[in-house]
């Protein structure tokens, strides 16, 4: 029973350390994002362009069909 408690305590301790390291890294990443607004603009462009390409792929054939009347 004592070894089980010791093992559980060790796992809890290691998990707590791991969690605190992850939080520190996440905080550092958030500070970098606040310091560099250009990166956030690039992320927005990356999200926007695939959406725009998908919409164009759906609507361009329909528009072309209506213009040329060759459906």
UniProtKB/Swiss-Prot annotation:
GO cellular component terms given for this protein: extracellular region
Gene Ontology biological-process entries: defense response to Gram-negative bacterium; defense response to Gram-positive bacterium; hemolysis in another organism
Sorted UniProt keywords: Amphibian defense peptide, Antibiotic, Antimicrobial, Cleavage on pair of basic residues, Cytolysis, Disulfide bond, Hemolysis, Secreted, Signal
Annotated signal sequence range: 1-22
Localization, UniProt: Secreted
Removed propeptide positions: 23-45
Reported tissue expression: Expressed by the skin glands.
Pfam families, per database record: Antimicrobial_1, FSAP_sig_propep
Source taxon at top rank: Eukaryota
Disulfide bridge positions per record: 65-71
Described purpose of this protein according to its UniProt entry: Shows antibacterial activity against representative Gram-negative and Gram-positive bacterial species, and a very high hemolytic activity.
Stated family: Belongs to the frog skin active peptide (FSAP) family. Brevinin subfamily.
Stated name of the protein: Brevinin-1E
Source organism: Pelophylax lessonae (Pool frog)
């Amino acid at each position: 029973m004592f070894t089980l408690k010791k093992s559980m305590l060790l796992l809890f301790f290691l998990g707590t350390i791991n969690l605190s390291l992850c939080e520190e890294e996440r905080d550092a990443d958030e500070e970098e994002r606040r310091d560099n607004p250009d990166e956030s603009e690039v992320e927005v462009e990356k999200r926007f362009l695939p959406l725009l390409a998908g919409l164009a792929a759906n609507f361009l054939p329909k528009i072309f069909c209506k213009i040329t009347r060759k459906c």
